[in-house]
Amino acid sequence: MRKILKLFLPIIMCLSITFTSTAQPKDSFISEEVQEICVKYGEEYGICPELLMAMIEKESSGRPDVENGGCKGLMQISDRWHKDRMKRLGVTDIYDPDGNIHVGADYLAELFEKYEDVGIVLAVYHGERNAETKTELSDYADWILTRSAELERMNGK
């Protein structure tokens, strides 16, 4: 009996850890309006809306008025670096949630086209050094992908 217990105890422990780590996350604090915008541009650019929502949670905690080091709004867009993109997309107010997410999704789509690997795309978006040559997933990318998966589960995907 003890041999059987010793054999199955590690398996039971691993299963309990696995099921505990996949428990439902707390509700997203992203507003319904922002979620709808993420769905709109997710569909337009072929990007998972939950990925956009996870990025917004990480970049700005869902606050459209945030500014950090010249990066602004929900997706922390630099109007200095994305001036041409903003003009092309007709975005005049980078703090406007629709315009900010539009610019962010357009930039992400460009990065996906160039790099294809979501880990590299997120690292480049985040401005990490040597992002194109990294072989390991950055902490930023890992957080975004984990949260995106949680949001997908919350949305029944």
PLM features: what roles do these ranges have?
Residues 54, 74-76, 121:
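Structural recognition of the beta-strand scaffold that forms the well-ordered cores
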Residues 47-72:
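Secreted/periplasmic proteins that engage bacterial cell-wall peptidoglycan
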Residues 2-37, 41-45, 63, 80-157:
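Non-catalytic cell-wall polysaccharide-engagement segments
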